[in-house]
From Swiss-Prot:
Protein name (database record): Argininosuccinate synthase
GO molecular function: argininosuccinate synthase activity; ATP binding
Subcellular location: Cytoplasm
Gene coding for it: argG
Protein species of origin: Exiguobacterium sibiricum (strain DSM 17290 / CCUG 55495 / CIP 109462 / JCM 13490 / 255-15)
Subunit structure: Homotetramer.
Amino acid sequence: MTKQKLILAYSGGLDTSVAIKWLSKDYDVVALCMDVGEGKDLSVIKEKALLVGAIESIVLDVKDEFANDFVLPALQYGAHYEGAYPLISALSRPLIAEKLVEVAHAQGATAVAHGCTGKGNDQVRFEVSVAALDPSLEVIAPVREWKWSREEEIAYAKENNVPIPINLNSPYSIDMNLWGRSNECGVLENPWTEPPQDAYALTVAPEDAPDQAEEVIIGFEAGVPVSINGTAYPLAKLITELNIIAGAHGVGRIDHVENRLVGIKSREVYECPGATVLLKAHAALETITLTKDVAHFKPILSKQYAETIYNGLFHAPLTKGLKAFLTATQQDVTGEVRVKLYKGNATVTGRQSAVSLYDEKLATYTKEDAFDHEAAKGFIKLHGLAISTHASVHRQEGVKK
């Protein structure tokens, strides 16, 4: 009997390697591995999938698509879940789901699978995205279904000749892409315990960072970062370069206890050196290029966008509407921002734009002052008219009583 095809989102780790063997009982498994900037040797991962039992192993380089279509809107919104988490893993999941569906269609597969556990956010993100893109596809979650302990999973791997990763004894659960690195589990599960240095990989300890500050100038065109110190880069490459530059100064460490979608609190340690610099630089440029009403309203939608992405609703109609508003706000976000990097800090020290709304002649207190001071009197009277009327009415009522 011919087996039906299944496309598995494959990482090369123990869970998805065991999943290939487990799923192969009922399906012809096609392993799909995507490069979103995690820095792995994907050729090794491709061969490992075939060794374990996949009938085909596909590797896709999606770094540019990830940067331009998923990271960029989050950057332009200044999106942070609960004001802290810059959506590192949450941004890559809808793209991975899109590619799962695309390959499933190309291969004539009837099902897709992922390696998420039953208590994380990613299972929701994958499955809701697949349902939005093609609800006819079956989604299988082997790790959630088999309910093995780690010891039982290792025993199964050994019995079925599945290679055991050399980093299996690491206490951490790590996910990484262009936008940063997420780390949880092990000693990090105690929110009182300070993260040890081995919990970090992209950043040096701030106290060990250089004693000499470094300044970088980020160039933007219509809200898109396009250059570092005058050198132009595609967005994915620009983020990668900034990860190296800012990481060397200990910039971008975040220690956060967040409220997961599934109802639990989770302590996470994030590293996002490039993201930290870009988010600060972009926000600084908007202070001189957005009008007051847009600048005050945009953070409301930024919070909504962050929660929408975090909750796995990238492919929901709301996201399309939020992006439409965002596009309208970015046309004038063009200019340069200077950022100083020093011992864990990224400090904006200057911003300039050819379309800046900051008028020094209106702002100055020198003799160059062009502000119409006489106009202030009438403005104040009208601005306070409602409150002064209210006060007058209630003062009269008090007299009557």
